[in-house]
Structures are given as C-alpha cells and as structure tokens.
C-alpha cells in the first residue's frame, strides 16, 4: 500500500510540492508521467547498451577476465557510493535538477567510454558511468514515489515496466543489430535522449524532499526495512542470474545457437514488461500481500518448468513464467520501503536500491560458483528457493488494496 500522510492532502503543501504545469492540470499530468517514464526508459536503455557492449570493450583494451572483473567492480563502487549520496544531493539541490543531471550524464558517460582515447580516460568514464547510474536509480524512484503521493497510486510497476522496455530497446540497438560503430551509435542515442529530454524533463516534479536524508545506523535495526532490503537483494540476484546464465543454460542443455539461446531472456523480459504494465491495477484489485504471494509462487513454478521440462518450448515457457512472477516484486518493494512511517522516504529508497543493485552484481558470480561445484542446472535451483522465500515473506506485507487503509 502507498501510505499518504495528511500533509500531502493539504492544499498549501500540494502547491509547494508540485510545480506549475505539474500534475494538477490534465496536460501537465500526462507530461509529468511521461517525463518520469522516460527516465526509467533511459535507465534500462543505456544499461542494456553497456551490458551488450562489454565484449567489445574487453577486446578493444585487451582485458583478461580478471581485469574485466576489476573494471566492473570499480563501476559498481561508483554506483553504490552515489546511490548513498543521491538523497543528500536531492535534498540540497532539488529533485528535478539532480534527476535531469543524472539522466543526461548517464548516456553521456556511455559516449565517453566508447570514445576514450586512452586507458586513463576510459577508467574515469567507467567511474562516471557507475556514479550516474547509481544516482539516477535512486532519483528516478524518488520521482515515481512522488507521483504516487500526488494522486497516482497505480504507477510504480508501470514505470519499472518502462525500464524493462528500455532494456529490450538497448539489446536491440547494441546487441542484435550488427556490430561496430559504437561511438556513432552512442552519440545517436545521446542526441535522441537530449531532444526528447528538452521537451519532457521540465515537467519533472520539483522539490521532492523528505526531511532526513542520511541513513543512520539505528535505522538499520528496523526489521521491516531489513526485510525489504533482503527481498530486494534476492530479487535482483535472480534478475542478474537470469540475464547472465539463461542463454548459456539453453545453449548447453538444448545445444542451440547463441541467437536461439537468447530467446530465454527475451521471453523472460517480455513477460516481465507485460506483468509490470498491468501490475499496478492487479495490486489495486487483489492487494499487495496476495500479489507478492502469487508472484513468488509463479517465479518458483517458472524456474521449475524451465529446468525440468524436456522440450525447448517448455523451457521458454518456464522463463516467461519466471519473468511474469518477478515482474512486480521490485516495484512493490521499492514502493513499500518508501511508504514506511518509521524511516524517511529517502532512506527507505536508498537502502533497498543499494541492496538490490548489490544483488544484481553478485547474482551471476554466485550462480557461477555454485555451478562450478554442482552444475549449472542445479545451481539455478537457487532461484526456485528465492521464489519460495518471497511467497512466504508476503505475510509481512499489508493485505489491503491500493487506496484502502489497513484496518
């Protein structure tokens, strides 16, 4: 449930929080929602463009696997650091300004990565890329939560669906359609983003602030916040593991080509998009607790199907079902963490963002280590366990529907 405190209903407070041309006029409503959705789309698009270009970067600089691992660790460190600082920057400089800067810096850093004339410039670009990604991840969720607080209770899952759509677009732009010309493609990507952003980003919500912006150690003793963090971590472990290992699993088991092996992740992503687009309405209809329980069960059933169905079509159906099950977990966790009465919105979002991003990073190597010992198929049983844990954890979520207070 999205809890809205009484102050958000006060006319004077609403006017202060929502800029002119914001969500109180019909054209402004559409433009504000579109602007925030475009942020999520950019995030998925640029992240996928980078991920599919990693082999090119490795070959261009002759990195070995260990050096590439260090490189990704440096990028992750920058992301985690600026995730932690994003709330502070938003508090000091304003949400709209920082959201715009991070959203434009992210694709700009991608151009610098491909155009870097030497290794030192490349390393600086990687740090900048990670920092922009981390800050943008937190800030765009601030904007999403602000929309929920200003009359759009069914929006978080849809916005995360826009991110998944961006991921598909990034895979198509940089992974499927040819090879080479990375600088030209990244510049074209940045130019398109700048053109659309010039029109949309002035309509982002401004002054999205929430009092305390520092994560105090004492707040980590909050059991519900810790639970949200653990669930965010496990959910993103699964996302990272499927992104990395689903293709290899199908290639090994079904003896298919690289292109055909990619269909597993495509099926996963397509059903995730479908689930997120409809997720807010489903949550409104059946309640948060029921949706979490169903999602965890679908995820476990999907991974079980993908592992044990003998046919290739059956395995694809399993990955699709897994994507449907995973679709609404992150949006709900983020929304609930930002709605807690015992910690500020900024602290809740920052904590679950850091936990989730950490899970996405460590998920593939965790599965890889387990696979070395017991085989990839058995290692992926871990994802079935994640679904069971999520379904059991549904009892800690409110059972009420959106807009209905918990009795």
Swiss-Prot record:
It is found in: Cell membrane. SUPFAM superfamilies: MFS general substrate transporter (SSF103473). One of its GO terms (molecular function) is transmembrane transporter activity. One of its GO terms (cellular component) is plasma membrane. Changing residue 71 to G: In strain: RM220-3. Changing residue 174 to L: In strain: RM220-3. The keyword Cell membrane applies. Residues 1-24 are annotated as: Disordered. Changing residue 100 to N: In strain: RM220-3. This is Membrane protein MosC. It comes from the Bacteria. Its main location: membrane. Changing residue 184 to G: In strain: RM220-3. It is a multi-pass membrane protein. It comes from Rhizobium meliloti (Ensifer meliloti). Keywords: Cell membrane, Membrane, Transmembrane, Transmembrane helix, Transport. May be a membrane transport protein that could either transport a precursor for rhizopine biosynthesis into bacteroids or the finished product from the bacteroids. CDD domains: MFS_MosC_like. The chain crosses the membrane at residues 31-51, 69-89, 109-129, 157-177, 186-206, 225-245, 255-275, 290-310, 316-336, 347-367, 377-397. InterPro entries: MFS, MFS_trans_sf, MFS_Transporter. Pfam families: MFS_1 (PF07690).
